[in-house]
A protein has these predicted regions:
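N-terminal amphipathic/hydrophobic targeting modules at extreme N-termini
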Residues: 5-6, 10-12
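Contiguous domain-boundary segments centered on the initiation and propagation of an alpha-helix
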Residues: 86-136
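Conserved phosphate/anionic-ligand binding catalytic regions in large, soluble enzymes, centered on
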Residues: 28-46
Length: 241
């Protein structure tokens, strides 16, 4: 089966309720095994968290919930998350050696289990600190097939996968910042596919998450970070998964 350009088109299967599944959703991603949920997804969680922090962490506390906690050791979930923190993709052949590589890099890693309320069974919470003392807390879940969902950043809600080029901004909650950010994206030709807004309280801290259709233009992060009231800006574009 081909598309209009004559290129092969992935076959699709239809399950109950008419849900359409791409054959690649069933086969899963290219990865170091054994599990797309417990290994590939876990590596992606660690990698997204590292990019949200903005640098390699010096300390990492990793909390594993549900099946991540009960079967994660056998599936290499802990090693996969640490590999992601080292910026390894799920198919990196060094993934099984991530503990040693992290130790050689001087990263302090602690791993323990936790029971979270109303959380997806494949959920991890990461508390990270870089060498400058900057901190980050991220909750994320592995949904299967190497796909993930970030649930919260520093305790504030979020819901994004990291599959699209994504801008994440932490800012003061006051009038005008959202419009300034939107104008900056428009000036540089970045089209927003989805936009989410969260805040801890009125007048407190807020999070903007904007998924974009195309690669993010050069210099965008610096322009957004310079907007008055923006506390931290991350432009998330992961190569290699």
């Amino acid at each position: 089966m081909t598309n209009r350009a004559g290129r092969p088109r992935p076959s699709r299967l239809f399950g109950k309720c008419g849900v359409s599944l791409n054959i690649f959703d069933i086969m899963g991603p290219v990865m170091v095994g054994p599990s797309s949920s417990h290994t590939a997804g876990a590596a992606r969680i660690g990698r997204v968290a590292r990019h949200l922090l903005g640098s390699q962490p010096a300390q990492a506390e990793i909390l594993l919930h549900g099946s991540f906690a009960s079967t994660g050791a056998g599936h290499g979930t802990d090693r996969a998350i640490v590999a992601g923190l080292l910026d390894m993709a799920p198919d990196d052949p060094n993934l099984p050696h991530s503990f040693r590589i992290a130790k050689d890099a001087g990263i302090e890693v602690s791993i323990r289990t936790v029971e979270l309320r109303d959380a997806h069974p494949n959920t991890a919470v990461l508390h990270l600190t870089d060498r400058s003392g900057q901190t980050l807390s991220v909750s994320a879940s592995s949904l299967g097939g190497g796909r993930i969902r970030v649930n919260s950043i520093d305790g504030m809600g979020a819901a994004f996968s990291g599959e699209l080029p994504t801008v994440i901004i932490r800012n003061e909650d006051r009038p005008g910042i959202v419009s300034e950010v939107s104008r900056a994206l428009s000036r540089r030709g970045a089209n927003i596919a989805t936009m989410q807004l969260y805040r801890d309280r009125r007048g407190g801290l807020a999070v903007m998450v904007m998924e974009c259709d195309d690669p993010l233009p050069d210099g965008l992060r610096e322009e957004l970070a310079a907007i008055d009231g923006v506390v931290r800006c991350t432009c998330l574009e992961l190569e290699g998964g």
